[in-house]
Amino acid sequence: MSQETILVTGGGGSTAHTTIATLLEQGHRVRAMVRKLDARADTLRDMGAEIVVADMLDIIAVRAAMQGCSAVYFTMSISPNYLEASTNVAVAAKSLGVRAFVNLSQMTVSQMSETETTSSPQQKQHWLAEQMLRWSGLPVVYLRPTAFFDSMFLLQGAKGIREDNVIRLPFADGKTSLIAGADVGAAAAAVLANPAPHIGKVYDLTGLQSLTMAQYAQEFSGVLGRTIQYINVPPQIWEAKLREVQLPAHLIEHLITMGQLHRDNRYDRMTDSFQQLVGRAPISAAEFVRRHAAAFTPQSESSSKATSH
């Protein structure tokens, strides 16, 4: 059991929750940095985490939140301010002399350079943030996951699956090795629990399978017991829909780029990095659907099952 404190930023995010839970179960002290006090923060506090509220764009608040911590897990949702936030956290970590800085990046970065980039401003900022961290001299571990099941199907696709039995995405026949946010969180926890062997290393994290969206639809069908179909949405219609719902411009450009990269088969990659770090295989597509079946099940069907029991 470690008496040192580990700081986890983005405490309300999909990876951070599992990271915090795992570390607490192992007896580590965890400080969760959140943007505001809400139900998610209450849950983390009930689990045993220390809660601190700080804006990552406020370097003074970030440094105060990090005071007394031996390691940092930096994770942040998609934001036009990502590079500034990551720099603030890195500057504070350098000033305070943390012994490990675990950075949650993106797998696309492994195919980027100053001459090879993408159209996504988010991916560009991830690449720049990694350059900054390398120059910083901090003891960094780089986690680069592929796309998440959670964002693909819970945030974007759940309504279409639940109400219309369809997955609508502009990926054509491109394959993607989706990973669960909880698995990424487990990988981060494994590194934070014993960071020394991992300092300076890069881990590209993929899921168990690399499948087309039509094949993912088959996985949904098998678990849910009804036919789920994949509809390949033309890119221009996809872009129009994104703008119609008035998503932030930064996010729209990122999603458009992800669509193109999937059509180009850039997400068809497999590694065993997760197995190396955690000691088990990442969860399958079918297992992800089972764990979140309620999100993909029509309300009437859920009610009838509850009544029958």
Language model regions located:
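Residues lining the SAM
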Residues: 9, 75, 279
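Cofactor-binding loops of NAD(P)H-dependent oxidoreductases
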Residues: 54
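A hydrophobic C-terminal alpha-helical subdomain
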Residues: 198, 236-309
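Oxidoreductase cofactor-interface core, primarily capturing Rossmann-like NAD(P)-dependent enzymes
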Residues: 2-43, 57-60, 64-69, 78-87, ...
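Contiguous C-terminal substrate-recognition/catalytic subdomains in enzyme active sites
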Residues: 227-231, 299-300
